[in-house]
Amino acid sequence: MARKILVVGGAGLIGAGAALHLAEHGHAVSIAGRTPPNSKALSKLPFVRGSFLEDDITDAQLRGFDSLVFAAGNDVRQLPPGEDEAAYFHRANSIGVPAFFARAKDAGIADAVYVGSYYSYVVPERVAASGYLRSRQAADDGVRALAGPDFKVCSLNAPFTIGYVEGVIALPIDASVRYLLGQYGGGGPRWMIPGGANFMSILSYAEAVEGALERGENGKGYLVGDENWSFAHYCELLMDALGIPGKIEVRDAEHPSMPDFGLYAGRGATVAYEPDPDMLTRLRYRRHDAERAVREMAPYYRKLAEAA
């Protein structure tokens, strides 16, 4: 059944991928954010200007939708200069995200998906020491606590998500490509930190969003994912897709394209897991799609790097 869906954070990689996928599958999708997206494909979708933190997405606007996909959790990119990190993330994520979902529930939205972070699921022992991780866990818990007979909500907790949408720049991917192209990093042999992560294409994630809206268990937090790769293997796949010969050295040092402040599992940690079979049966997203995503995104990010 076609739905009227609002995607908050639709200008980011995950939100954009979900919005376009849902629109391609016959849903009436609008995206919401502070500024219109810089993407030809996304610009074809209706745009709702506003910030969930400022309450300027009105209740009347929310009442026009059947479903909500929320991909606007705040991270270091939104942290205002000079502001206390823990206090900001508590206000934006711990408090702001569940409050927005409560408004959506009160407005009559029937189904919602929260795009969460996988860290509290895979390294729960590190949550207490990080204001950011505490805020993402609190947002996830707070959103799912709103589940009820008239409001179906679940979370999809994302791993390292890769791919591209024209006009959208995912900074971690952009940084890795620029490093491999030699645009920064000091020259010398290309290297990467030890450890690894679970990687997932934005198409697989978008299919998981669609599955969650249609068949997700109310109040459930899902740990989604696809392929377990070392960071070195990921960079070698990127090098191959970029046409760069050679292999990646592994060094236990802070990396220019993957700095320690963004490694919430810790430098050298390997986050590896297999998605739950029951979840896969319910959400029905494709597997083993991450390598395709690397091959397809590499020319796009090369073009961005060479135009800079």
Segments (PLM) and residue ranges:
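Conserved beta-loop-beta element that borders a ligand/cofactor-binding pocket
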Residues: G116, V143-V168
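SDR active-site strand-loop-helix element
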Residues: V8, A32, A71-A72, A112-Y118, ...
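N-terminal Rossmann NAD(P)H-binding glycine-rich loop of SDR-like oxidoreductase domains
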Residues: I5-H25
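NAD(P)H-binding glycine-rich loop region in Rossmannoid oxidoreductase-like domains
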Residues: S39, L45-I95, Y121-P124
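Conserved Rossmann-fold NAD(P)-dependent oxidoreductase catalytic core, especially the SDR/UDP-sugar
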Residues: A86-S135, C154
